[in-house]
Amino acid sequence: FLDGLSRTGVMGILKHVPGMGRVTTDTHYGLATIDTPVDVLGQTDWVPFGAISGTHWMMTAHVVLSAWDDQPVTTSTASINAIREHFNDPMIISDCLTMVAIEGSIEARVENTLNAGVDLALFSNGSNEERNRAVLAAGEPRMVRESLESLQPLSSEARAHQIAKLQARMGTQTKTADPTWDRPS
C-alpha cells in the first residue's frame, strides 16, 4: 500500500508508534500504558513498522511506554529520541492533541509536543478558538525559523538542487498526475 502511494507521489504515515495492540484504553478518552519491555516489542509489535517501506513519516500514539519514561510518547523527549533511533530518524507527527490522553491547555499540549521533538503537532478536532490558540502556541515552524535566520538568497539552480535533495531524502520523485485517471475509457 505504502509503495503504491509513494509511486504516485503521496507520502503515507505509519501510525501509531510505538503501537496500540497491547492497550485496552481508548486514547481518545484516557491515557494508556504499555509495560512490555522494549526488546519484546522490538521482536513482536514493532516488526510491521520495520518491514514496511515507502514512508519516512510516523505518527505517535498517546500512550506511556514505561520502559522509556512516565510521559505520553507524544510529549516525551526520551520517547521521541528512541523512536528516531529505532526507526531510522523519521519525520514525526503527533496524533490529534485534543484527545483526552494528553493533558493541559491546548497551548501546553502544543508546546510540550514540539519541545519533545515532534516535527508536526496535529490539531484535527476542537473549536476554531482552540485551533487559533494552538496555531499561536506553535509560533513559526522551527525549521522555517531556523532556516530564515541563516537564509541567503538562492539562485533557481540552487533551489532546484535543494528540492532534488529533499526528494531523494524522502524517497519520492516528481510525478505528473493523469487528470483522466478516474474517467471511464
Regions found by a protein language model. Name each.
Residues 1-146, 150-153, 169-179:
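Second-shell residues forming the walls of enzyme active-site clefts
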Residues 163:
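A mobile, often basic/glycine-rich helix-loop segment
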Residues 166:
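Short linear clamp-binding motif
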